[in-house]
Amino acid sequence: MSKKIQKDKKKTHKRKMRYRRPVNWLFLLLLMTAFQIFCAIQILTNGGEDIVKGTIIAVFALYITVEWTYFIVFAGFLRRKSFEVELIAFFLSGIGLALTTSVYPNKAYTQLIAILLGIGVFIVLLWILSDIDRVVKLRMPVAILSIAALVFTLIFAKNINGARNWIVIGNGLLSIQTSEIVKVAFIFVGAATLETLQSTKLLTKYIIFAVTCVGLLFIMKDFGTALIFFFTFVIIAFLRSGDIKTIFLICAGALIGGIGVLTFKPYVANRFNSYCHIWEFADTKGYQQVRLLIYSVSGGLFGLGLGNGKLRGIYASTEDLAFGMVCEEFGIIIAFTVLLTFVALVVYSIRYSVASRSSFYSIAACAASALLLFQTALHVFGATDLLPWTGVTLPFISRGGSSMMCCWGLVALIKAIDVKTYKRYDKVVKG
């Protein structure tokens, strides 16, 4: 009987570890390259007088070169076969680069550097994640550094747009949003702590860490990011416990706390009083959202073309209104494709979680993909007034170096779930 059970276990394990046929990355890369060249041509054709043609050509040439170099090295020399996650990241980053270059030609190199730094974060983090023992050892130092970074930001950050979440260095030369970097650390610490949950002490430590992070963000008045952190905490807790009742109690407690804050801190409620009333505040608080609704639909299925939109003239168009710009200048088809890519990352994480090497990789990947999808939902539905507007960025596409590095860090957590990512485990699977 025991032999039969053992045999069944081996069959189940083999079924879980079975190779799934990877996508044809070369065809998709060629298609993506053609799309990016088309974007560059549009910017050169429709750009204003401030467009420096040499800069545009150089930026896109460098970006495409980096893309191809990455795939040639990892597919040709390192013999990797699965590139679904990287294709999505490069596709979205390319759209962000095109929008930023089109609206702010002088910031083209800055955005390109942000993407390169993000790719660097992706590669380094993948190496760190290759060893689960290394991950567990780094858990506490990462947690301490994360709290320290948020406290430092709270003390020294400048108040920008009502929130104290930016560290400005060199008279505006460089600005860092530490909460973006802590997003990756938040999932890293949570997944590593709950990887082998053996005591209430470990769970308590993570709860203290999570509450501290959310509390500091709330004090900074960065409510959108605080909501994202809370959502991620709920996802991680559910993935580890699977207890719906516990999750319900956590959410109920948070709701009661939120109502209390809105009651005793009226200035917080005032930030959301235009929700569902943007047309009544069309020239004040609802100015950006009203323009987004008007201009984004004018793009139709195929868009007006880069440089031809009107939304680009609105304040923070490449940050807070990025999805509207995609709709207006790229069209509904590309905009819908962008949304589908975030859904695809969630599906990818769930699909590969059954064959991950440990619960850390399953928790980290599912939490990271859920965070990206939730943030996208907040951005899209907030800008269109279906949800209260929090001003969160659209992952990969909104302009910003901190956000870009965070997004590449999150996709590293997603990528690590696939055993084919690491050569030594790839051999085990084939065997």
Which role does the model predict for each range below?
Residues 19-23, 37-59, 77-87, 97-117, ...:
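Interfacial transmembrane-helix termini
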Residues 200-219, 223-263:
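Hydrophobic alpha-helical segments of polytopic membrane proteins
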Residues 35-36, 59-73, 91-98, 115-128, ...:
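Central hydrophobic cores of alpha-helical transmembrane segments in multi-pass inner-membrane proteins
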Residues 2-19, 35-40, 377-431:
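A juxtamembrane structural motif centered on a specific transmembrane helix
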Residues 62-66, 115-121, 183, 329-349:
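Hydrophobic alpha-helical transmembrane segments
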Residues 160-178, 248-338, 360, 364:
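Hydrophobic, glycine- and aromatic-enriched re-entrant/interface helices and adjoining loop segments
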